Amino acid sequence: MSRRCDLTGKAVLTGHLVSHSNRKTKRRFLPNLCNVTLQSDVLQRSIRVRISANALKSVDHRGGLDAFLLKARDEELAPRVLELKRQIVKAQAEAPAAA
């Protein structure tokens, strides 16, 4: 399991831990990843994803998983979530035709 956010693409960064005397030792900055279950209103089901805490706030801010995925760039999304985005777009296209 990689340490990468499924929605925003945030990953591990490397840098230095700098002491008071300015000595530098290598360190890793890990993303704050959470395993969460989000509800898709269009697909009428819940989806389990591993996302950063920042992405969780962004999903809430945009009004849910469906709205977030529709605005998100495809390059940032994990392949599994990208397939989910395509399913949402397809379901939305079929919904007005059925109504």
UniProtKB/Swiss-Prot annotation:
InterPro entries the record matches: Ribosomal_bL28, Ribosomal_bL28/bL31-like_sf, Ribosomal_bL28_bact-type, Ribosomal_bL28_sf
Transmembrane segments: none
Keyword terms of this UniProt record: Ribonucleoprotein, Ribosomal protein
SUPFAM superfamilies the UniProt entry points to: L28p-like
Pfam families recorded: Ribosomal_L28
Any GO CC annotation of this UniProt entry: cytosolic large ribosomal subunit
Domain of life: Bacteria
GO biological process: translation
MF-aspect GO terms: structural constituent of ribosome
Family, similarity comment: Belongs to the bacterial ribosomal protein bL28 family.
Name of the protein this chain belongs to: Large ribosomal subunit protein bL28
